């Protein structure tokens, strides 16, 4: 079955794996998925990123992060904002602060995929891909 929205698929795989308390999850590899994973790692939501396989069978394995002795997932929610049917673009001033700054909006800009904080520092806007908190 073809996947029309790989970003939503990635977010769903991460959300499902963290709810089941898996230590890692595999997602189909793409440049966009790898960029989003790097932002998640930089912001402290995942532990590590490993690329496996070659060509169209390549995958990205993400190490999921948990806190406390009950292993509560660090990622509480992931919401897709800009969808294939309705793209959402924001300028620097319009970039949202997720949960008053506790969460992260992942933004695709002309200078690459980055968090909303980094985009504000650089003074650029872009397509708001998702919210993570």
UniProtKB/Swiss-Prot annotation:
Protein family according to the UniProt entry: Belongs to the universal ribosomal protein uS8 family.
General function of this protein: One of the primary rRNA binding proteins, it binds directly to 16S rRNA central domain where it helps coordinate assembly of the platform of the 30S subunit.
One Pfam entry name: Ribosomal_S8
Annotated GO CC locations: ribonucleoprotein complex; ribosome
UniProt xrefs under SUPFAM superfamilies: Ribosomal protein S8 (SSF56047)
Gene source species: Prochlorococcus marinus subsp. pastoris (strain CCMP1986 / NIES-2087 / MED4)
NCBIfam families: PRK00136.1
GO biological process: translation
Protein name: Small ribosomal subunit protein uS8
Subunit structure as annotated in this protein's UniProt entry: Part of the 30S ribosomal subunit. Contacts proteins S5 and S12.
């Amino acid at each position: 079955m073809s996947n029309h929205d790989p970003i939503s698929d990635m977010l769903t795989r991460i959300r499902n794996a963290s709810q089941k308390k898996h230590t890692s999850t595999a997602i189909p590899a793409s440049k966009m998925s790898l960029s989003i994973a790097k932002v998640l790692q930089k912001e402290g939501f995942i532990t590590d990123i490993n690329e496996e396989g070659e060509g169209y069978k390549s995958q990205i394995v993400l190490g999921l992060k948990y806190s406390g002795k009950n292993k509560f997932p660090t990622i509480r929610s992931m919401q897709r904002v800009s969808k294939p049917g309705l793209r959402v673009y924001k300028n620097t001033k319009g970039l949202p602060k997720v949960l008053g700054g506790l969460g992260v909006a992942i933004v695709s800009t002309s200078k690459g995929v980055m968090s909303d904080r980094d985009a504000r520092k650089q003074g650029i806007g872009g397509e708001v891909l998702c919210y993570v908190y």
